[in-house]
Amino acid sequence: MRLAPVAVALLLATAPPARAELLPDVSVHLRAARYAPARTDFHWQGWIGAGASLVRVRGARAYFTSDVETIIGNTLRAFEANQANYHLEAGVHHAAGRATATLFFHHVSRHYVDRPKVQAVDWNVLGGRIAWPVRTGPRPLRVTASLGHTTLDSLVGYRWEAIAEIDAEPSRVGAAALFTRANVRVVSVQERPRLDRGGFADVSVEGGTRWSRDGRTLDLFAALERRNDVLLEVAGAHNSALFGFRISYLR
């Protein structure tokens, strides 16, 4: 993850000192959800992470984010984590009219918890992303799309990765908004002997109630998802419903 300090150095070196702003914003977020139906290795899912824009120069911001995804089941104990997946990303955001364009380097590393693992399971993606606020105001609509290619992978064989997401708040009820979110991730795969499967698509659709105020957001949601490669070293897809909450804060 050497891209973050390189991006910061380039921005600082190419702009007048008076125009460089350090740490213009920071964010934290938390998500917890219950699988339905619950399976032995999949009872709960948790995400926790934080991020920061390290420096802002004119319309560009160098940033870094870090997230941990934890999968909880009851294989060994009634309530025990069995997977910990680390997501690290560094890059540069740049304003492009109403949209925001991003050049990013994303790293994912997956691990068992309290279990032996000899085979490394990780990958890096270098790519671009565009986030566009199609509609603002009391009923906002936001579209995000990205395309990237792996620069390194262990075991998984991933090559191209394309992601598209729509987040909309079609109506409001008092201080709350009803929201819906849909996400599709398409991955091309170079087949490997240990993982006998080709390319795939992950899909999730969720809806619920959202409260937002001064950069703070609480979502209560229900979701349906189809997710591939849920087990670290075995190919396969997992279809499930999830019920949970998401808290985020941007300052």
Residue ranges, per PLM feature:
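Transmembrane beta-barrel domains of bacterial outer-membrane proteins
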Residues: 18-251
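Cleavable N-terminal export/targeting peptides
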Residues: 1-21, 250-251
